[in-house]
Amino acid sequence: MRSLSCIVCRQKKIKCDRKNPCTNCEQAGEKCMFKEYDSRKIRHPHSYVKALETRLAGLEAFWKRVKYAPVNEKLELLKTISFNDHLSPDISVSKTDTTFEFPVSLDIRGPNTIAFYGPTNVYGPPLTPSSPETPSFPPQNPSFSPLITDCLKLFFKWQYPQFLFINREAFLVDYYYRYHEGRYCSEHLLYAMCAIGSRMSVDPNIAALAKNFYQIAWNKIIEYGLGKSHITSIQCLLCLGYFNIGMGNTSLGWMLSGMAFRMGQDLGFQLNPRNWSVNDHPVVSPADAAVRSRIYWGSYVTDIFISFVLGRPTTLKKSDTSIPDSESLPDFDGVNEYRVNNALLLKEYLCIQSSVY
């Protein structure tokens, strides 16, 4: 006796005695056929099911792009379809840790801002362009006063290891030479860094300016730093979040850091920008991709640190990440003044340790 009903009985939805041939087929004069194997016992691995879901999401996103694309672009989009076997069970089982890159839609709002939308977004391209009356990023006119420069040096010498979401080389090159056209140095970020750096000054008059710097940074980011997501706004929010946590305002610090992470996800900073292109031209240069990598992984460490200090769950998940590890940018003349003073940090650490024990 077989373990499965015959195909005819299953189609007619009648009880089969599972003989070969079965009684129902004999009486009806039909050919009795059985499946060779029981597919109910087949269990696909989770990675295989995940690959199917990812493939389906990609196809849905692709056809949405085709739907909203101009007529002259639809054919070009169809030519990009690949019919390779993406769902080999052997490959899926052997690569259980593979990160699946979801298809993205990019809203390029200007040279400094790119918004990311995943496969389930309801905004079909083209999106509404930004209003010209609303600046997508703050005006760039950082101050070169000795006070500002000294506070920045204090920030990088004493606090930088905790603020690795700021790429020192990219920031300083933009601060001094406007090399990146303000992408990595803005007023609100500058004053947020000064608020933290000034507190490390041995001069009580400079240390007392920390709250003033904080208020300036806060006013500026409220004025023009939240309307559109921007890299320096992410960094500023994290600096302000750290500042508040250090002052005991843990709820506000937690909220500001959460805003920063959400803004980063709006920019897709957890994804590998080297895969983004428009008309076969990369959207993000290799140098900018390296900076974005540092910003994301620095934010990732910050998320873990703040969550650990406050005993709360993290926001950024490694499983959602495809951006590669960060790399160091080349030095430039004058960067030594902004290096972390390891000897002084060790000396202070030993002093603190001796006072505690």
UniProtKB/Swiss-Prot annotation:
It holds the Pfam family Fungal_trans. GO terms for molecular function: DNA-binding transcription factor activity, RNA polymerase II-specific; RNA polymerase II cis-regulatory region sequence-specific DNA binding; zinc ion binding. InterPro entries: Transcr_Regulatory_Elem, Transcription_factor_dom_fun, Zn2-C6_fun-type_DNA-bd_sf, Zn2Cys6_DnaBD. It comes from the Eukaryota. One of its GO terms (biological process) is regulation of transcription by RNA polymerase II. Residues 6-32 bind DNA. It is found in: Nucleus. Keywords: DNA-binding, Metal-binding, Nucleus, Transcription, Transcription regulation, Zinc. The keyword Transferase does not apply. One of its GO terms (cellular component) is nucleus. This is Uncharacterized transcriptional regulatory protein C11D3.11c.
